[in-house]
């Protein structure tokens, strides 16, 4: 009550921010007459003037009034479009590291030109980030004339571009591209083998369009660059045949492990678990199929990978549905983006899930992939010095933007008042009743010439509605799963009188639906239109536009509520643009996923009390409130998941930044010999310590083991036993110095043969390749640790703290392994002529290029807990037999027999 009173007196923070910015807008408007008097040349010269002022130390914020006035005037001359005052406000919000919420149709694309121009003046680059390649190209080409008029260069960053083309795009003042491509380029740059291969500059300012989609909806799925791993397709096929014999547990007991069925499903967390009966049955079937030996357990260390196959196959059959989560096309399983309904060609699920789905569908199984590099959007976009974003719906997620990205959300007022009618939800008992009501509503509205946009949450649902409309003889267009440039064209014409368009989630987002259709596209279709033709097209459009307005404007039908209120608001926001008439309504049934999982008991209880009959709908504020509460539950759960993901990824992010920083330093220097010498000293000290403990008695020395290690790992023949025999007084310290000196001299002889420059290049190449190889293995180990760490909670330990502690220990061990591997490779390489080193370097580069060609980019992963960290250690030790005198794999530096080997 007190907060409401204070807000009434002083205004909300949003109001105060807009009042402050309105004063600057007034200044810009006062400048307009003077700016209008400038010639084109004088207006263009303003860009150079601003740059000079910045170079002399003037603060960027001081340029806002004049710079915005210049962009507005340039837009008037180039496009014939003048920025509204609310667009100037939006531009200022975007310059202040904030999220600007601007309603659909308020001109976000034109608004973005203001902060993009202002921040490009420093010459450090601006990245305008969009959700797909089509929008990136469209916005870049549409705005190119304006920016080039003002003397700025434009670049477009698209997939499959060559490195020189990408470098040119990033060198431009303003670069348009997708969030995926910017992120993948960052990862690829940090896998480059020479400075010339890198394409990005330092990350300066990112302006993210549809920011809620990119920073929230896609935040849970990291960007991953992966390479091929071992082939295990046969096992997926064999395990897949067993899964259909398992029966789902009907009732979810508090102890799902003791249930009646073979597996239980948790729909809220999208997890599936074997019950005790299921475990017994699957073990029995595995034995009968000859996959597992009699008397073995699926949970025994030797069967960890088999458990991985069973879990993946079970999830593929139970949790992933054809035409909802994926489609099968030309013998290939293609993921469907849950947020947009579009197919994601070339993207694959990780952890063997994609292979399990391929086995289920009977298509060719492709090899599993191993992660080479990964980053979440949360951590990628936080690398920018300055970040801002815009969307039509951000206010419901303001807390998340603030807590994770430190971005405030400012709601920018509309240019004209919103008059759209948002009708109350109608709830039916069954899906069939709901679909029937939707068809009748469409029939009535189209009969009056009113255009209708039907929003669905999946391809499957859009096809169901489409089939019913076809049966009813209602002409319509369907947008789902396949993104192409025509999508925007279809969406732009969805405002034609009586048009019916079905679209999944956000298909066509970024394109306005103009009442009466788009006259611009009609003119564009003509080769060389005359003035008369253009006038006739505009006149015909005006008649259609007026007819649609008279019928009530665009009507939005939601076939069910989404998990997030924000996505519902996005669908509603397609109607009522720029003060146009419009309406919206959601149709729900008790069989909808959201209602079934989160709101079923309470709402179905209400419906029973009201004595509803088949075909009747309930329309009541209580129901709407219950649904809103269900959505809040889901939003809260999803926020917790994203927050938890970030907390864990922050640990990996610190390590990633350290590795990438070290790697970039390595790329930028030509001579790493000092580093090599320092590493060699550390490695030999650690190695000798394993066999000759410091200040120990000679009886404790393992000279035979040391000689063997030096021979095997460093190709050094050192008669240490003979030295000690010939020189009884040989001191331990002197012995250490002699071993190191001999190693250095042996290496110097190699250097004399091949030449200093060649050896420096080879050293650098070996360091880079070894670093990449160990980092790749470390990422896999971190994944396994992350998947099993939640089990530490059962031991009354904080999983996050345990993860931080163990991942740091793993990182330290990796750095020690890096030193050892580098010195081992450099010591063992046999060279006689410079050509041999050159051949080795060429071979190394060819191998790196081959791996680069085999890389797969993915932004769709699945974070299921498949293996515990303890199980991974055992599995790894079973894969590779460790000799008793070998260094212990734990990275302690001790011999295996003196460390973890003592347990056997």
Swiss-Prot record:
Tell me which cofactor or cofactors this protein depends on. Answer: Zn(2+)
Give GO MF terms, alphabetically: ATP binding; metal ion binding; protein-exporting ATPase activity
What switches on its expression?
Answer: Repressed under conditions of excess protein secretion capacity and derepressed when protein secretion becomes limiting. This is regulated by SecM.
Q: Which reaction does it catalyse?
A: ATP + H2O + cellular proteinSide 1 = ADP + phosphate + cellular proteinSide 2
User: Which family is this protein grouped under?
Assistant: Belongs to the SecA family.
Q: List, alphabetically, the NCBIfam families matched.
A: PRK12904.1, secA
List the PANTHER family: CHLOROPLAST PROTEIN-TRANSPORTING ATPASE, SECA INNER MEMBRANE COMPONENT OF SEC PROTEIN SECRETION SYSTEM
Can you say what this protein is called? Protein translocase subunit SecA
Taxonomic source organism: Yersinia pestis
Gene encoding this polypeptide?
A: secA
């Amino acid at each position: 009550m007190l907060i409401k009173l204070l807000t009434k007196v002083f205004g909300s923070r949003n109001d105060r921010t807009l009042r402050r910015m309105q004063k600057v807008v007034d200044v810009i408007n006062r400048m307009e007459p003077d700016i209008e008097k400038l010639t084109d040349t004088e207006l263009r010269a303003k860009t150079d003037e601003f740059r000079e002022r910045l170079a002399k130390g003037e603060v960027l914020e001081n340029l806002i009034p004049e710079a915005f006035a210049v962009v507005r005037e340039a837009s008037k001359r180039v496009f014939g479009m003048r920025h509204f005052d609310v667009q100037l406000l939006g531009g200022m919000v975007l310059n202040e590291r904030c999220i600007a919420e601007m309603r659909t149709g308020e001109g976000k694309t034109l608004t973005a030109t203001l902060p993009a121009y202002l921040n490009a003046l420093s010459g450090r680059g601006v990245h305008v980030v969009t959700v797909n390649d089509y929008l990136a190209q469209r916005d870049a080409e549409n705005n190119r004339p304006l920016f080039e008029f003002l003397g700025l260069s434009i670049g477009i960053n698209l997939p499959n571009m060559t490195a020189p083309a990408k470098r040119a795009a990033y060198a431009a003042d303003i670069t348009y591209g997708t969030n995926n491509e910017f992120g993948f380029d960052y990862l690829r740059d940090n896998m480059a083998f020479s400075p010339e291969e890198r394409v990005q500059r330092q990350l300066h300012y990112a302006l993210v369009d549809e920011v809620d989609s990119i920073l929230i909806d896609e935040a849970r799925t990291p960007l991953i660059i992966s390479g091929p791993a071992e082939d295990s397709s046969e096992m997926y096929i064999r395990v897949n045949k067993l899964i259909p014999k398992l029966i789902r547990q009907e009732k979810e007991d508090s102890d799902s492990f003791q249930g009646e069925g073979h597996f239980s499903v948790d729909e809220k967390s999208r997890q599936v678990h074997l019950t005790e009966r299921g475990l017994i049955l699957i073990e029995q079937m595995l034995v009968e199929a000859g996959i597992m030996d009699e008397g073995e357990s699926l949970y025994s260390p030797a069967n960890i990978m088999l458990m991985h196959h069973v879990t993946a196959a079970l999830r593929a059959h139970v949790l992933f549905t054809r035409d909802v989560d994926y489609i099968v096309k030309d013998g290939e399983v293609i993921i469907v983006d849950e947020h947009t309904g579009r197919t994601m060609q070339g993207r694959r699920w990780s952890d063997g899930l994609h292979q399990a789905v391929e086995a289920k569908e009977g298509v060719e199984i492709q090899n599993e992939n191993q992660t080479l590099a990964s980053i979440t959007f949360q951590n990628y976009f936080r690398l920018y010095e300055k970040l801002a974003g815009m969307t039509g719906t951000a206010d419901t997620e303001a807390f998340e933007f603030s807590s994770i990205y430190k971005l405030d959300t400012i709601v920018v007022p509309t240019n004209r008042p919103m008059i759209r009618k948002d009708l109350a939800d109608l709830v039916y008992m069954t899906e069939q009743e709901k679909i029937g009501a939707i068809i009748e509503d469409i029939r009535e509205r189209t009969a009056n010439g009113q255009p209708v946009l039907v929003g669905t949450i999946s391809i499957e649902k859009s096809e169901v509605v489409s089939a019913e409309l076809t049966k009813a003889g209602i002409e319509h267009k369907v947008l789902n799963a396949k993104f192409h440039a025509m999508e925007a064209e279809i969406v732009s014409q969805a405002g034609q009188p009586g048009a019916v368009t079905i679209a999944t989630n956000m298909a066509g987002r970024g394109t306005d639906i103009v009442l009466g259709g788009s006259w611009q596209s009609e003119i564009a279709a003509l080769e060389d239109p005359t003035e008369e033709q253009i006038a006739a097209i505009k006149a015909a459009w005006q008649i259609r536009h007026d007819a649609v307005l008279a019928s009530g404007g665009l009507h939005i039908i939601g076939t069910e509520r989404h998990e997030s209120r924000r996505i519902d608001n996005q669908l509603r926001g397609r109607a009522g643009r720029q003060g146009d008439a419009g309406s919206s309504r959601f149709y729900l049934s008790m069989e909808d996923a959201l209602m079934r999982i989160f709101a079923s008991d309470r709402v179905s209880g209400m419906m029973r009390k009201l004595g509803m009959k088949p075909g009747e709908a309930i329309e009541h504020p209580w129901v709407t409130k219950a649904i809103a509460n269900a959505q809040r539950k889901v939003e809260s759960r999803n926020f917790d998941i994203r927050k938890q993901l970030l907390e864990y990824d922050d640990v990996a992010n610190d390590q990633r930044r350290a590795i990438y920083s070290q790697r970039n330093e390595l790329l930028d220097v030509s001579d790493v010999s000092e580093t090599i010498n320092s590493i060699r000293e550390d490695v030999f000290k650690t190695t000798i310590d394993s066999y000759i403990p410091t200040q120990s008695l000679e009886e404790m020395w393992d000279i035979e083991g040391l000689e063997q290690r030096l021979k095997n790992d460093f190709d050094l023949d050192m008669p240490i036993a003979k030295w000690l025999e010939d020189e009884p007084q040989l001191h331990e310290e002197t012995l250490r110095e002699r071993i190191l000196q001999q190693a250095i001299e042996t290496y110097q002889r190699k250097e004399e043969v091949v030449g200093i420059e060649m050896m420096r290049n080879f050293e650098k190449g070996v360091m880079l390749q070894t670093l990449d190889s160990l980092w790749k293995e470390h990422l896999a180990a971190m994944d396994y640790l992350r998947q099993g760490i939640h089990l530490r909670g059962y031991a009354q330990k904080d999983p996050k703290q345990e993860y931080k502690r163990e991942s740091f220990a793993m990182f330290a061990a990796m750095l020690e392994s890096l030193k050892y591997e580098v010195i081992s490779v450099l010591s063992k390489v046999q060279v006689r002529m410079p050509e041999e080193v050159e051949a080795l370097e060429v071979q190394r580069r060819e191998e790196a290029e081959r791996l680069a060609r085999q890389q797969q980019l993915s932004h769709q992963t699945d974070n299921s807990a498949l293996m515990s960290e303890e199980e991974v250690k055992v599995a790894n030790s079973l894969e590779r037999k460790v000799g008793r005198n070998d260094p212990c794999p734990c990275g302690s530096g001790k011999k295996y027999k003196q460390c973890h080997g003592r347990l056997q």
